[in-house]
Amino acid sequence: MLKKVSQHFWKKENQIGRINKMSSDELIKQTLESAKTIAMVGVSLVKKEISTNIRRRPSTIVMKYLQEFGYKVIPVNPFSVGEKVHGETIVGKLNDIKIPIDIVDVFRPSKEAPMIAEESVKIGAKVFWLQYGIQSDEAKKIVESKKIFYVSNKCIKQEYQRLFLKVSPVFPALKSS
């Protein structure tokens, strides 16, 4: 199905002569419906201020949420190799994953996105997803040149909630009264 999504997009893109992946709800929904395995780059076990509460990290919150909806999420962090988070063992890099990856979801700074994009191409990922606040024109060029679906500056958890559960993507703690 992900191959179908990618083919559909490229056919449509050639018809209209431009790329507009970042705002396509239909393509994002099809992607989330068909994906089974997500590599989450940048899963952190502890906050920088040395907190021991791993559940408060955005990456671990999103990881747990996706697991609850049936996705296999493989955490990637070169500084925490071998440690466990939400029942999964952290690997050091994308190349360490031995199963096919549908989505590479990135929780790293924008400047690291091109390198992660190159690794995503090498492992044959179908989708390259940059979380809120992360954008990279260079990474976009890398993945799109290989016909990999590119999403940036969107939270995969909030997109799932919005498109499937019709839930407001605003965190309850941030809602005004």
Where are these predicted regions, by residue range?
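Structural/interface elements that position substrates and couple domains in central-metabolism enzymes
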Residues: 2-10, 15-102, 110-177
